[in-house]
């Protein structure tokens, strides 16, 4: 994707594919209104700056995930770039967290901006080494692939004072047992299930 210019990316329709393919069956299940479906058509890919500005406008809290880059961009100064944008836009620190599978980047953020909240991602690709490594507890807060843990382990870890969030968690049964076990946050493709259970973003 590094061969695309920003202008080319901004020309794309980033929403119609969802309406046309219904990848998770949510349209067929009647969980998305026609008004929302109509709003998907012609959606544009936002820049990081545009996303932060919208987050500020709507008073949301956002997870800024620093994505591992392809080989052609391995020397891109990811941490410096995002920190500069945060400062330039006067983004309040209580409105965002910074997360990444690249734990070296998170350590760099900690060093340069210790007041920022960070969350270490674990579990992609789904290798056994990841299942072992995250338990070294280099960080206070983790987001772990649900496939790599159990409610019993979450209960044990949170009782030790660590914050554990889960991703790749999409069933109501999992929501219930992991919330009861003490998970701090849920990252899911089905927030409407959580809303129906009385939880909110």
Model-inferred region functions:
Residues 119-201:
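C-terminal active-site rim and adjoining tail of enzyme catalytic domains
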Residues 1-117, 137-138, 160:
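Metal-dependent phosphodiesterase/phospholipase catalytic core, i.e.
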């Amino acid at each position: 994707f590094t061969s695309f210019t920003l202008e080319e990316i901004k020309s794309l329709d980033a929403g119609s594919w969802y309406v046309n393919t219904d990848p998770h069956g949510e349209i067929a299940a009647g969980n998305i209104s026609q008004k929302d479906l109509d709003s998907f058509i012609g959606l544009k890919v936002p820049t990081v700056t545009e996303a932060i500005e919208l987050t500020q406008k709507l008073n949301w809290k956002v997870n800024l995930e620093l994505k591992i880059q392809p080989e052609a961009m391995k020397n891109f100064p990811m941490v410096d770039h995002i920190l500069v944008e945060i400062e330039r836009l006067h983004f309040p620190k209580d409105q965002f967290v910074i997360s990444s599978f690249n734990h070296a980047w998170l350590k760099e953020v900690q060093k340069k901006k210790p007041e920022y909240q960070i969350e270490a991602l674990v579990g992609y690709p789904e290798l056994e080494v990841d299942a072992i490594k995250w338990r070294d507890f280099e960080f206070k807060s983790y987001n772990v692939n649900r496939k790599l843990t159990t409610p019993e382990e979450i209960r044990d870890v949170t009782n030790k004072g660590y914050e554990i969030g889960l991703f790749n968690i999409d069933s109501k049964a999992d929501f219930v047992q992991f919330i009861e076990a003490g998970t701090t946050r849920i990252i899911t493709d089905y927030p409407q299930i959580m809303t129906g259970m009385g939880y909110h973003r």
